[in-house]
Amino acid sequence: MIETDKLAAKAVSAERIISASPASPNEEAFERALRPKLLDEYVGQEKVRGQLDIFMTAAKNRSEALDHVLLFGPPGLGKTTLAHIIAREMGVNLRQTSGPVLERPGDLAALLTNLEANDVLFIDEIHRLSPVVEEILYPALEDYQIDIMIGEGPAARSVKLDLQPFTLVGATTRAGMLTNPLRDRFGIVARLEFYTPAELAKIVTRSSGLLNAHIVDEGALEIAKRSRGTPRIANRLLRRVRDFAEVKADGIITREVADAALAMLDVDAVGFDLMDRKLLEAILHKFNGGPVGIDNLAAAIGEERDTIEDVLEPYLIQQGYLQRTPRGRVATASAYQHFGLGAPKSGPVRDLWDDNQ
């Protein structure tokens, strides 16, 4: 039952235009076409870019493999893009896989033994590696060696294979789920942060050029403001706004055109969609601002509990519109203000409102 709820939550997330997860293989192909190829083309993440630039330059000067890199942060911020940039900047090949795909030690061994000197192996969702596969990875990361078993039963024996020096780039949205032994083997650990509207506007402008779409600065900024700090969402919204501009306007994406297109898509000024507003309005109007238990809230809006916890709540909490308390969910003063409602007269939200004044 729990697994079914998780699958339902993932399906709901994929359907939302403001979801940070890739919606389809077609969208993944679209992302690849817009992906920057070099570090100089990569917008945002200034600290991470600066660190990688120094570490890669030093490794190239010594003709060594770059130290192993762990990239973590919310989905859609550019972890896969950075892995490709690292390989291109280092002038080596990139092999890409993901944690769930590597089911057996032999799957990983086949990848490792086919790597050439200083190549990059990119493992997405590395937190989902199985324990038996992870055990094989430890000596590979430390000593560039793996132990494989040949034969079965009493005749089985362990054979040590030497590997070419390589760089593992691991990406995860859940760094806390990595085991300590695996985390400790990464020499470079970088957290990707949400983007500012100004940074996203630069990304939207760059993507518009690649799509041969005409956009003005105000139009790019309007899209950026509603993209929840995530380049993947910004590029997805840009595609839909471009369609609107070509059909309903003169093909030029102005602030007014972007606003009309995003209103048609039910994406409001802070990046909320219908589901976000439905959740907040239920707490505000049906439960007087809260607190309300998660099961009551799920019943009130007709969604699964996992959908609320995994898909809807994280962004609302992060942006300060919702709080989780021991007694249940509580709408904050920002939620009241967003919907043009007056200050609550009493209760836990009253204190939050007073704190914001």
From Swiss-Prot:
Record's catalysed reaction(s): ATP + H2O = ADP + phosphate + H(+)
InterPro entries, A to Z: AAA+_ATPase, AAA_lid_4, DNA_helicase_Holl-junc_RuvB, P-loop_NTPase, RuvB-like_N, RuvB_C, WH-like_DNA-bd_sf, WH_DNA-bd_sf
Sites where the protein binds Mg(2+): 80
GO cellular component terms, semicolon-separated: cytoplasm; Holliday junction resolvase complex
Main location, first listed in the record: cytoplasm
GO molecular function: ATP binding; ATP hydrolysis activity; four-way junction DNA binding; four-way junction helicase activity
Record-level GO BP terms: DNA recombination; DNA repair
Subcellular location: Cytoplasm
Span list, region Large ATPase domain (RuvB-L): 4-195
Taxonomic superkingdom: Bacteria
Residue span of region Small ATPAse domain (RuvB-S): 196-266
PANTHER family, per database record: HOLLIDAY JUNCTION BRANCH MIGRATION COMPLEX SUBUNIT RUVB (PTHR42848:SF1), PTHR42848
Record-stated family: Belongs to the RuvB family.
Protein name: Holliday junction branch migration complex subunit RuvB
